[in-house]
Amino acid sequence: MVLSYDGPSVSSAGVSNVACSGSVSLTVVGRGGAGTSGFSGKVRVGATACAGSVWRSDSGVVCRSSSGGITDGAVSVSSGLQHGSVSRAVSYNAPVVSSVGPSNCASSGGLSLTVVGRGGTGWSDISAAASVGVTGCAASVWRSDSGVVCRSSGGIGGGAAVSVSSGVQRGSVSAAVSYDAPSVSSAGASNVASSGAMSVSVCGRGMGVSGPSAVGRVGGSACASSVWRSDSGLVCRAVAGRGRDHGVLASAGVQRGSVSGAVSYNAPSVSSAGASNVASSGGLSVSVVGWGGMGVSGSSAGGRLGLTACEGSGWVSDSAVVCKAPGGVFGGAVGVVSAGVQRGSASL
């Protein structure tokens, strides 16, 4: 006849939540099989053995939990070759984040952020990881069950959440960190052709971390293209325009910075007119030619002969306007072309 002793049977653990730092007493209760003396078996929470186990009776053992970070972990009791368990009995506390300091960091990253909470941030350097927004920190250093130091990655934007994960659990605090907004100190070219297509180096800081993260503007117009160079500079290819003392703006995400009065488009310059003699009755088309600055579209430039505006002005290019001469009696008139508030002239 073969005789077998009942294996351990586990029905419950005394507490369902424990600190991830461990050292919480769990009363493991079952229906026998835990032995008859000081207890030779082991108790485990999840895959980790308890730091210590004290036998109370054939149906009860007190276990001092080890550190951990699981959720819905099984509790098992082994006695000899036999064991029993109950599933989903114990969870370690999830991280709780209460504050982050400092609240501003450079868009280039590299700043140490102290993430403070109320427990649940793990039990060793490898147990907790922090994120700012959707980007993981470049490095996370565990300090205690309630604190982690995070070295921020580069980023843009304001009001980013900070989260700490420990195992499969995580906690976060919203709107905790903002990256510095762009700041523009100067533009590399103070004058650009009204036809555009000129590269303007925009210098400052806080312009993001990659090619598509920053965009430049000259006046009210976005640059034809913006090429990120560093956290402190981008190159903007100016679009066609007119006028003077335009501000230059750089935006990174929803944040922006600008400098005023940085760029002017070249004023019109007039060198010659296509007809040197015009009937006093007017009506003759005169081609007014120059070296640029005459605007960017059909309505951007206007012509004058003498003191009288042309009856009609047709824009041809950045360097030419066709003026329908007004009637008049004058000699050696001055031809004037205006584009916005700027103008150029020549004696014809």
Regions found by a protein language model. Name each.
Residues M1-L348:
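Ser/Thr/Pro-rich low-complexity tracts
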